[in-house]
Amino acid sequence: MAVLVLAGCTSTDGGGRGEGTRAEGDRPAGSGPYWVNPRTSAARQVTAYVRDGERENADLIRRIAGRPVGEWIVPEDPEASVAGVTGAAEKAGRQAVLVLYNIPHRDCGQFSKGGAADGDAYREWLEGVARGIGDRRATVVLEPDALLHLVDGCTPEEFHEERYDLLKGAVERLKRQPGARVYVDAGNAGWQTPDALREPLRRAGVEEADGFAVNVSNFQTTEASTDFGRRLSAEVGGKPFVIDTSRNGNGPYDGGDPALDWCNPPGRALGEPPTTDTGDPLVDAYLWVKRPGESDGDCRGGPKAGEWWPRYALELARASD
């Protein structure tokens, strides 16, 4: 069942705005080519802890605040949002990681429900995203869960053709931007099998994309994700892939209600820092697509999906020792 492996994918952090960004000091050691937004909720939390004299907690949250994370582009004014982020990244000599999560009928009405009102609204929004990228460099993760919700039947059949058309069209439009690298979301190692994804990925435009993304907002280990990605790559012409390692340090959770294994599970840890130095020619990058410390949804005492949750952020950072 898809509910076992979905994750709350929205971000209410203001990701995608880039106001007040700095050109210097934004890249920690090991971040590779990716830009660190100094205005994330994690960064603000560090400031608050320092102000309140909570030095130990501040040091823990710096493990998140000092890393590049995905910028989840808000529905409102996408051109300005994306231009702000990619422009700030360019000034710092880096590139932004953009996450597009606005597909109509998103998340099957679950914790992260929403999305564009219809296909035309989505295309208009996507056009704004593309204009905002311009000729700057950006790594784009395209629509987490959107394809998998077609494969598992969560999305009603009447919306399938339109969604395939929107995904393929998004790949084609974004690839007109010379600096954009586009990865179609392909679920995770605990969801669907590679052979079940071959034709859906083809219909979604993976051949025109730079590759696909695995483990977005999930907890599968890097080893399991790499194995899954390699097998899936063999099904789609050897395409490379990126892995979301943001919270996979301790692997997936297998305690309590299986239907909530994906939602704010306890005892998880930060994973490998973002980098393009993966040691595997098929793995283009480890990314922190999900922003560690943001809730998966209102489960296990957490706030709504995408909201910053200091307690969970501290647990993730502390478990990474």
What are these regions (language model features)?
Residues A29-G132, R136, R291-L316:
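N-terminal carbohydrate-binding/catalytic regions of secreted carbohydrate-active enzymes
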Residues G93-V97, R137-V141, G179-Y183, A209-A213, ...:
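Structural preference for beta-strand elements that scaffold enzyme active sites
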Residues P68-V74, S112-A117, L148-F159, Y183-A186, ...:
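Surface-exposed cleft-lining segments at the edges of enzyme active sites
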Residues G115-D135, P144-A180:
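Active-site cleft segment of glycoside hydrolase catalytic domains centered on the general acid/base Glu
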Residues M1-A2:
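Sec-dependent N-terminal signal peptides
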Residues S41-I64, A189-P310:
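Surface-exposed substrate-engagement region within the catalytic domains
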Residues L6-R27:
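C-terminal region of N-terminal signal peptides and the immediate post-cleavage residues
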Residues G84, E124-R131, E162-R173, A196-R203, ...:
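Alpha-helical scaffolding segments of alpha/beta enzyme cores, especially the outer helices
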